[in-house]
From Swiss-Prot:
Catalytic activity, reaction form: [(1->4)-alpha-D-glucosyl](n) + ADP-alpha-D-glucose = [(1->4)-alpha-D-glucosyl](n+1) + ADP + H(+)
GO-annotated cellular components: cytosol
HAMAP family given in the database record: Glycogen_synth (MF_00484)
InterPro entries: Glyco_trans_1, GS/SS, Starch_synth_cat_dom
Official protein name in the record: Glycogen synthase
Keywords for this protein: Glycogen biosynthesis, Glycosyltransferase, Transferase
Record-annotated membrane-spanning stretches: none
Keyword Glycosyltransferase: yes
Coiled coil: none
Purpose: Synthesizes alpha-1,4-glucan chains using ADP-glucose.
EC number: 2.4.1.21
Length: 476
């Protein structure tokens, strides 16, 4: 089966979020299952540098000007790059300028991505033509609309990684996008008078997926649907909405082989994990104390991630004898609050603003608990990394967090299924109660080790998702 993934990021060459991790791992897992998989992306500078050897497939005239499609390989996967320097050759983020303002021509930049994917489905590359086109998030949403406009030359799947980002643009641009005028309606890509690239993907795809079973249910409700819940309810009734859990790339995230760690370890050698803890405490200026559990945050610092709750719960966490490590960036108010906490609680709170992939590995390996108290979380990867590294996740019961972490309630400890700590209400007091339960388990090292080992043996590899996606493609 020939599959084309349409997206805007690819780990490790270009990453702004979890989408890049998915595209860096899922195609390879599908290839291992026998699929013929390729990816199409805009030729952003980081991607051009990372894939320097490419050949010209075709040059064509488009609504965005003359465009070259180039082809190369990265880690065994075929990669198409859309070479349009006027649109894509910009330093920094693929979505916004240095002042964090979205590029004014994003409507054109990402429409071209969908257009070129559709052209491949129509035979642009005479040597390869996809049977299934799999578009990811709003950046690729118009892919499904272009395929529908061209008579559906390939089957289409659209994956929602985060429904909150909808790709909304002025209806004035419709004439520039070479889409049928009749597509701009409620039963189409119109959303409150604007063009929604996300809705285009949802409405015109043959099948819609999202990145966990629970999130697939949640987004059919007003609290999580961002105005799309009616359409998503209809898709669910038609059997066209599926949740498939993301996985962990074990080539990158595995404490047995992770070269970014001071000391590698596994479930049978957890003493070596303590060495990583000492290194982390030293690096973050924390008191060296093996008996103090380290709670870690590796995240965008936003209210959506529930990190305001962490600040509210911090006094209790410290009073109980814990330490806090934070790596991330985002909301300026939250950044300042965490930095102030580090200054006030020197030796017990360490904060690093920014994101460093290598250091994120060291934090997850060196910590005892990874905090993911999100208000909503489509899937979440951080808690999966925590499980893999024996760093017990403390999460809110939402989205993929609900699907992957089993609370250390007595009955779950008794039957051996417990893998972390879960709270329900989106309130600081609920988080505090979960933190207290973590300390209770911490005070019983034998039970803590038992939960750690169980968590580390859970299988959240990408092969499971790859098989599920390929099975879905065959049913279309």
């Amino acid at each position: 089966m020939r599959v084309l993934h349409v997206c805007s990021e690819l780990f490790p060459l270009l990453k702004t979020g979890g989408l890049a991790d998915v595209i860096g791992a899922l195609p390879a897992a599908q290839l291992a299952e026998g699929a013929d998989v390729r990816i199409i992306l805009p030729a952003f500078p980081d991607l051009r540098r990372g894939i320097p050897e490419t050949v010209l497939v075709r040059e064509i005239d488009t609504f965005a000007g003359r465009v070259a499609l180039r082809y190369g390989h990265y880690r065994g996967i075929g990669i198409y790059l859309i070479d349009a320097p006027a649109l894509y050759d910009r330093a920094g983020s693929p979505y916004h300028d240095a002042s964090l303002y979205a590029y004014s021509d994003n409507y054109l930049r990402f429409a071209l991505l969908g257009w070129m994917a559709c052209e491949l489905a129509c035979g642009l590359d005479g040597y390869w033509r996809p049977e299934v086109v799999h578009a990811h998030d709003w950046h690729a949403g118009l892919t499904c609309a272009y395929l529908a406009a061209r008579g559906r030359p390939a089957r289409s799947v659209f994956t929602v990684h985060n429904l909150a980002y909808q790709g909304l643009f002025s209806a004035d641009h419709l004439s520039e996008l070479h889409l049928p005028a009749e597509f701009f309606q409620i039963y189409g890509l119109e959303f409150y008078g604007q063009i929604s690239y996300l809705k285009a993907g949802l409405f015109f795809a043959d099948h819609v997926t999202t990145v966990s079973p629970t999130y697939a249910k949640e987004i059919t409700q007003p609290a999580f649907g961002y105005g799309m819940e009616g359409l998503l309810q209809a898709l669910a009734r038609q059997g066209r909405l599926t949740g498939i859990l993301n996985g962990v790339d074990s080539d990158i995230w595995d404490p047995q082989s992770d070269t970014l760690l001071p000391t590698r370890y596994d479930a049978e050698n957890l003493q070596a994990k303590a060495i990583n803890k000492t290194h982390l405490q030293t690096a973050m200026g924390l008191q060296l104390a093996e008996n103090k559990p380290i709670f870690a945050v590796v995240s965008r610092l936003t209210v959506q991630k529930g990190l305001d709750l962490v600040l509210e719960a911090l006094p209790e966490l410290l009073a109980l004898g814990g330490q806090l490590v934070v790596l991330g960036s985002g909301d300026a108010t939250l950044q300042e609050a965490f930095l102030a906490a580090a200054a006030e609680h020197s030796g017990q709170v360490g904060v690093q603003i920014g994101y460093h992939e290598a250091f994120s590995h060291r934090i997850i390996a060196g910590s005892d608990v990874i905090l993911v108290p999100s208000r909503f979380e489509p899937c979440g990867l951080t808690q999966l990394y925590g499980l893999k590294y024996g760093t017990l996740p403390l999460v809110r019961h939402t989205g993929g967090l609900a699907d992957t972490v089993v609370d250390c309630a007595l009955e779950n400890l008794a039957d051996g299924s417990a893998s972390g700590f879960v709270f329900n209400e989106c309130e600081a007091q609920a988080l505090v109660k979960a933190i207290r339960r973590a300390f209770v388990l911490w005070s019983r090292p034998k039970h803590w080790r038992h939960v750690q080992r169980h968590a580390m043996r859970l299988d959240f590899g990408w092969q499971l998702a790859a098989v599920d996606y390929l099975s879905l493609y065959r049913r279309l």
